[in-house]
Amino acid sequence: MLRFLVLATLVLYGHSTRDFPETNARVVGGTEARKNPWPSQISLQYLSGGKWYHTCGGTLIRQNWVMTAAHCVDRKMTFRVVAGEHNLSQNDGTEQRVSVQKIVVHPYWNSNNVAAGYDIALLRLAQRVTLNNYVQLGVLPAAGTILANNNPCYITGWGMTKTNGQLAQALQQAYLPSVDYATCSSSSYWGSTVKSTMVCAGGDGIRSGCQGDSGGPLHCLVNGKYAVHGVTSFVSSLGCNVSRKPTVFTRVSAYISWINNVIASN
């Protein structure tokens, strides 16, 4: 049985073949991002005891829609989105805080079987954010786009900087080149845990996603332009930065029709 960890600040366990994926990820081996090279990145926060806490990342894809991981919004909580965020512990003067009005989770998502895929959700905001230098829409790939092996990509987020460590206060980024499906699904990597509707990146044992990065974007450079090709989903429960256990993302290009249909009908 393969153990994996979802990368929100809550842990889910899914089924696999050698060790469980964990869906609670933060950037390990990364560096602080400049303010703000990734303006589509948002912080998804929940209300508890009168205070707001970061739980996941996400991508602004419309002025009133955010894309994140389904496992980030499994629990019934009061959520808000903070766009234009850089340092969670201080007011940067660029933040826009907006309540989440509606949550649409992919209908095939099963929190008891993370490895089945469909770890994607859309959040409709109570109001539109204002676009500026610090808040921009993420560019999505064309439907069906498949990344080449070793394609340049960056993961971003406020997740833990090491396994069982602390959440980052400033937005982090780490270079995670893509790992093609044939390699990532081989027995020495993730095996059958990884599906064709997922994207793998990293796996060098140094840099990875970790708890708190879940739902956030994988930005990949294709034809000279960055687009959001992945939604951070899970890592190995053996640790965030385990060699040959790349961070696994929901492949955005597999869900373009679903995304468009949800937005059009809501």
Curated annotation (Swiss-Prot):
- What are the entry keywords? Calcium, Disulfide bond, Glycoprotein, Hydrolase, Metal-binding, Protease, Secreted, Serine protease, Signal, Zymogen
Instruction: Fetch the InterPro entries from UniProt.
Output: Peptidase_S1_Elastase_sf, Peptidase_S1_PA, Peptidase_S1_PA_chymotrypsin, Peptidase_S1A, Trypsin_dom, TRYPSIN_HIS, TRYPSIN_SER
CDD domains on file: Tryp_SPc
Q: What is its main location?
A: secreted
| Signal sequence coordinates | 1-16
Q: Any idea which GO molecular function terms this record carries?
A: metal ion binding; serine-type endopeptidase activity
Q: Which domain of life is it from?
A: Eukaryota
Report domain Peptidase S1 positions: 27-264
Q: Where in the cell is it found?
A: Secreted
For binding Ca(2+), which residues are annotated in this chain's numbering?
A: E85, N87, Q90, E95
What are the names of the required cofactors? Answer: Ca(2+)
Reactions catalysed, as given in the entry? Hydrolysis of proteins, including elastin. Preferential cleavage: Ala-|-Xaa
Kindly state what the record says about how the cofactor is bound.
Answer: Binds 1 Ca(2+) ion per subunit.
Q: Which residues are glycosylated?
A: N87, N241
Disulfide links within the chain = C56-C72, C153-C220, C184-C200, C210-C240
Gene Ontology CC entries for this record:
extracellular space
The EC designation for this entry is 3.4.21.36
Propeptide section residues: 17-26
Q: Which SMART domains match?
A: Tryp_SPc
GO biological process annotations for this chain's record?
proteolysis
Q: What Gene3D superfamilies does the annotation carry?
A: Trypsin-like serine proteases (2.40.10.10)
Chain's role: Serine proteases that hydrolyze many proteins in addition to elastin.
Instruction: Spell out the family assignment given in the record's similarity comment.
Output: Belongs to the peptidase S1 family. Elastase subfamily.
What's the protein here called?
Chymotrypsin-like elastase family member 1
Q: What is the lineage of its organism?
A: Eukaryota, Metazoa, Chordata, Craniata, Vertebrata
